């Protein structure tokens, strides 16, 4: 019975952690939390886009 609980717990941990990595940055707070800044249209210079800040035109750049 303990093995069933352990396997269920392992399955839940794997599924819950995988869902967080597939989603991009989608808000101002999560952008700032990932050490990014929100800018209109494009990321300048050597910065790259890591997500969007609520609107598709506002990019989260780091």
From Swiss-Prot:
SUPFAM superfamilies hit by this protein: Defensin-like
Position of the signal peptide: 1-22
Compartment(s): Secreted
Pfam families in UniProt: Defensin_beta (PF00711)
Primary localization: secreted
The protein's name: Beta-defensin 10
Tissues where the protein occurs: Neutrophilic granules.
SMART domains: DEFSN
Bilayer-spanning residue ranges: none
Disulfide pairings: 31-60, 38-53, 43-61
Family assignment from sequence similarity: Belongs to the beta-defensin family.
Database matches in PANTHER family: BETA-DEFENSIN, DEFENSIN BETA 4A
Known role: Has bactericidal activity. Active against E.coli ML35 and S.aureus 502A.
Keyword annotations: Antibiotic, Antimicrobial, Defensin, Disulfide bond, Pyrrolidone carboxylic acid, Secreted, Signal
Coiled coil: none
Organism classification: Eukaryota, Metazoa, Chordata, Craniata, Vertebrata
Organism: Bos taurus
Pyrrolidone carboxylic acid carried by residues: 23
Gene Ontology biological process terms from the UniProt entry: cell chemotaxis; defense response to bacterium
GO molecular function annotations of the record: CCR6 chemokine receptor binding; chemoattractant activity
CC annotations in GO: extracellular space
